[in-house]
Amino acid sequence: MLFSLRELVQWLGFATFEIFVHLLALLVFSVLLALRVDGLTPGLSWWNVFVPFFAADGLSTYFTTIVSVRLFQDGEKRLAVLRLFWVLTVLSLKFVFEMLLCQKLVEQTRELWFGLITSPVFILLQLLMIRACRVN
């Protein structure tokens, strides 16, 4: 079952442009990941592979701040605060997951076990389920 763009915007709370930025980051990340795993670029570190995701998170945070300020100026204070809170929560959990995964791939430490690394994703999925029930 595929979701329409309207449903994705409604459930995720992101604007269409933000979804496009994250999909573009996923495409660039996939290319860099394939290059890194195949060993075609020996100087490419895991931190460089994850740069598209970090850039997309930064651009999305910047865009959300601008939209929230504009909503606040237009008198939509409640909507501005709720949107800012929701999107920053989603982006923070995504960013923590990316940082922990990248650190695990670089250092290969035993202190970072995969249950700890994926815990932000599970929290995010629970929040998305709650939001999906509230939206409908």
UniProtKB/Swiss-Prot annotation:
Keyword list (alphabetical) reads:
Endoplasmic reticulum, Lysosome, Membrane, Transmembrane, Transmembrane helix
Which sequence ranges are marked TM in the entry? Answer: 14-34, 50-72, 81-101, 112-132
* Gene knockout outcome: Male mutants are sterile and exhibit a profound defect in spermatogenesis and spermagiogenesis.
* One cellular-component annotation, GO: endoplasmic reticulum-Golgi intermediate compartment
Compartments, as annotated in UniProt: Endoplasmic reticulum membrane; Endoplasmic reticulum-Golgi intermediate compartment; Lysosome membrane
| CDD domains registered for this protein in UniProt | TMEM203 (cd22816)
Start and end residues of each stretch annotated as Interaction with STING1 = 1-51
Task: Describe the protein's quaternary organization and the partners it interacts with.
Answer: Homodimer. Interacts with ATP2A2 and ITPR3. Interacts with STIM1 and STING1 (via transmembrane domain).
Q: What is this protein called?
A: Transmembrane protein 203
Native source organism of the sequence: Mus musculus (Mouse)
Upper taxonomic lineage: Eukaryota, Metazoa, Chordata, Craniata, Vertebrata
